[in-house]
Protein backbone atom coordinates (compact mmCIF):
# COMPACT_ATOMS: atom_id res chain seq x y z
CA UNK A 1 0.00 0.00 0.00
CA UNK A 2 1.36 3.44 -0.91
CA UNK A 3 0.31 6.82 0.35
CA UNK A 4 0.33 10.31 -1.07
CA UNK A 5 0.08 13.47 0.96
CA UNK A 6 -1.92 16.25 -0.68
CA UNK A 7 -1.20 19.81 0.26
CA UNK A 8 -3.54 22.78 0.14
CA UNK A 9 -3.22 26.52 0.64
CA UNK A 10 -4.08 26.77 4.35
CA UNK A 11 -0.69 25.89 5.83
CA UNK A 12 0.39 28.35 8.53
CA UNK A 13 3.94 27.00 8.77
CA UNK A 14 3.62 25.77 12.36
CA UNK A 15 5.63 22.54 11.72
CA UNK A 16 3.27 20.45 13.89
CA UNK A 17 2.84 17.88 11.10
CA UNK A 18 6.60 17.57 10.54
CA UNK A 19 7.17 16.91 14.24
CA UNK A 20 4.25 14.44 14.42
CA UNK A 21 5.42 12.22 11.55
CA UNK A 22 7.11 9.06 12.89
CA UNK A 23 8.66 8.28 9.49
CA UNK A 24 10.22 11.66 8.64
CA UNK A 25 8.11 11.93 5.48
CA UNK A 26 7.41 15.66 5.76
CA UNK A 27 9.65 18.71 5.65
CA UNK A 28 9.08 22.44 5.51
CA UNK A 29 9.92 24.18 2.24
CA UNK A 30 9.92 27.84 1.23
CA UNK A 31 6.59 28.93 -0.30
CA UNK A 32 5.75 32.51 -1.22
CA UNK A 33 2.02 31.78 -1.47
CA UNK A 34 1.35 31.71 2.27
CA UNK A 35 1.76 34.04 5.25
CA UNK A 36 4.37 31.89 6.97
CA UNK A 37 6.60 31.76 3.89
CA UNK A 38 6.91 27.98 4.22
CA UNK A 39 4.64 24.95 3.84
CA UNK A 40 4.81 21.26 4.59
CA UNK A 41 6.00 19.14 1.70
CA UNK A 42 6.15 15.36 1.43
CA UNK A 43 9.23 14.41 -0.60
CA UNK A 44 9.47 10.93 0.91
CA UNK A 45 5.92 9.63 0.35
CA UNK A 46 7.23 6.09 -0.17
CA UNK A 47 8.06 6.03 3.56
CA UNK A 48 4.54 7.06 4.64
CA UNK A 49 2.77 4.38 6.69
CA UNK A 50 -0.63 6.10 6.56
CA UNK A 51 -0.91 6.68 10.30
CA UNK A 52 -2.39 10.17 9.70
CA UNK A 53 -0.59 11.67 12.70
CA UNK A 54 0.24 14.64 10.49
CA UNK A 55 -3.48 15.19 9.80
CA UNK A 56 -4.31 14.99 13.49
CA UNK A 57 -1.52 17.41 14.43
CA UNK A 58 -2.49 20.02 11.83
CA UNK A 59 -4.51 22.89 13.35
CA UNK A 60 -5.82 24.03 9.94
CA UNK A 61 -6.69 20.69 8.27
CA UNK A 62 -3.98 21.47 5.71
CA UNK A 63 -2.91 17.87 5.07
CA UNK A 64 -4.90 15.02 3.61
CA UNK A 65 -3.38 11.54 3.48
CA UNK A 66 -4.91 9.24 0.91
CA UNK A 67 -4.16 5.64 0.09
CA UNK A 68 -3.48 4.87 -3.58
CA UNK A 69 -2.90 1.45 -5.06
CA UNK A 70 -0.98 0.36 -8.15
CA UNK A 71 -0.62 2.71 -11.12
CA UNK A 72 -2.69 5.39 -9.44
CA UNK A 73 0.13 5.91 -6.95
CA UNK A 74 2.65 7.13 -9.51
CA UNK A 75 0.13 9.52 -11.06
CA UNK A 76 -0.73 10.90 -7.63
CA UNK A 77 2.78 11.47 -6.35
CA UNK A 78 2.91 14.80 -8.17
CA UNK A 79 0.35 16.09 -5.69
CA UNK A 80 2.97 16.29 -2.96
CA UNK A 81 4.35 19.77 -3.52
Swiss-Prot record:
InterPro entries reported in the protein's UniProt record: 4Fe4S_Fe-S-bd (IPR017896), 4Fe4S_Fe_S_CS (IPR017900), PSI_iron-sulfur_center (IPR050157), PSI_PsaC (IPR017491)
UniProt GO BP: photosynthetic electron transport in photosystem I
EC supergroup of this enzyme: oxidoreductase
Disulphide linkage map: none
Function: Apoprotein for the two 4Fe-4S centers FA and FB of photosystem I (PSI); essential for photochemical activity. FB is the terminal electron acceptor of PSI, donating electrons to ferredoxin. The C-terminus interacts with PsaA/B/D and helps assemble the protein into the PSI complex. Required for binding of PsaD and PsaE to PSI. PSI is a plastocyanin/cytochrome c6-ferredoxin oxidoreductase, converting photonic excitation into a charge separation, which transfers an electron from the donor P700 chlorophyll pair to the spectroscopically characterized acceptors A0, A1, FX, FA and FB in turn.
Pfam family, one: Fer4_7
Protein name, per record: Photosystem I iron-sulfur center
GO molecular function: 4 iron, 4 sulfur cluster binding; electron transfer activity; metal ion binding; oxidoreductase activity
Compartment(s): Plastid, Chloroplast thylakoid membrane
EC number: 1.97.1.12
Subunit structure: The eukaryotic PSI reaction center is composed of at least 11 subunits.
Cofactor binding note of this UniProt entry: Binds 2 [4Fe-4S] clusters. Cluster 2 is most probably the spectroscopically characterized electron acceptor FA and cluster 1 is most probably FB.
Cofactor list: [4Fe-4S] cluster
Membrane topology listed for this record: Peripheral membrane protein
CC annotations in GO: chloroplast thylakoid membrane; photosystem I
Source superkingdom: Eukaryota
Coiled-coil regions, chain positions: none
Entry keywords, A to Z: 4Fe-4S, Chloroplast, Electron transport, Iron, Iron-sulfur, Membrane, Metal-binding, Oxidoreductase, Photosynthesis, Photosystem I, Plastid, Repeat, Thylakoid, Transport
Residues where [4Fe-4S] cluster 2 binds: 21, 48, 51, 54
Positions annotated to bind [4Fe-4S] cluster 1: 11, 14, 17, 58
4Fe-4S ferredoxin-type domain boundaries: 2-31, 39-68
Catalytic activity field: reduced [plastocyanin] + hnu + oxidized [2Fe-2S]-[ferredoxin] = oxidized [plastocyanin] + reduced [2Fe-2S]-[ferredoxin]
Amino acid sequence: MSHSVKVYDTCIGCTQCVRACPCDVLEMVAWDGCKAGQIASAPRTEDCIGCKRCETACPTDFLSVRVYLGGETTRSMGLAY
